Amino acid sequence: MARFFRRRKFCRFTAEGVKEIDYKDVEVLKGYITETGKIVPSRITGTKARYQRQLATAIKRARYLALLPYTDRHDD
């Protein structure tokens, strides 16, 4: 069996000391969305539960205000 080196997951928001995630910070939010527009789960990103809830709310607000797309593409 081959062993793989797995990078340790850590919460970026805890490390940076973020109090609240801002829905207007689109560049940060884009890092937590897949190509299809889905929110990436915390088990993959390593985000703590508190920040994952804030992240989901911020992404939904940004989508509602058209700062982020709901989906990446609409195939015709």
Curated annotation (Swiss-Prot):
One of its GO terms (biological process) is translation. GO terms for cellular component: cytosolic small ribosomal subunit. It holds the Pfam family Ribosomal_S18. The keyword rRNA-binding applies. Keywords: Ribonucleoprotein, Ribosomal protein, RNA-binding, rRNA-binding. SUPFAM superfamilies: Ribosomal protein S18. Binds as a heterodimer with protein bS6 to the central domain of the 16S rRNA, where it helps stabilize the platform of the 30S subunit. Part of the 30S ribosomal subunit. Forms a tight heterodimer with protein bS6. This is Small ribosomal subunit protein bS18. The gene is rpsR.
